[in-house]
Amino acid sequence: MKFLFLFLAILLATKIPVISGKRHNLRCMGNSGICRASCKKNEQPYLYCRNYQACCLQSYMRISISGKEENTDWSYEKQWPRLP
């Protein structure tokens, strides 16, 4: 009986870490993508993350290279520049 209490005391004192089943994923592209070694079937690789893995974005994501919100109003007047 003393051995059991001693074993429990040692077990609780060491605090064995519990490993969860889900890993922490790095986010990229303003939290729109996930850094992975290989992208899933419905994702497209775009650039690379800090850990040299591909930044995987959903195939429907739009990428703005200008860094600001783009104007998506595509009326006929805004498609072509005005002539002087």
Swiss-Prot record:
It is found in: Secreted. One of its GO terms (cellular component) is extracellular region. It comes from the Eukaryota. Residues 1-21 form the signal peptide. Transmembrane segments: none annotated. Disulfide bonds join C28-C55, C35-C49, C39-C56. One of its GO terms (biological process) is antifungal innate immune response. GO terms for molecular function: lipopolysaccharide binding. Belongs to the beta-defensin family. Has antibacterial activity. PANTHER family: BETA-DEFENSIN 119 (PTHR47902:SF1). This is Beta-defensin 119. It comes from Macaca fascicularis (Crab-eating macaque).
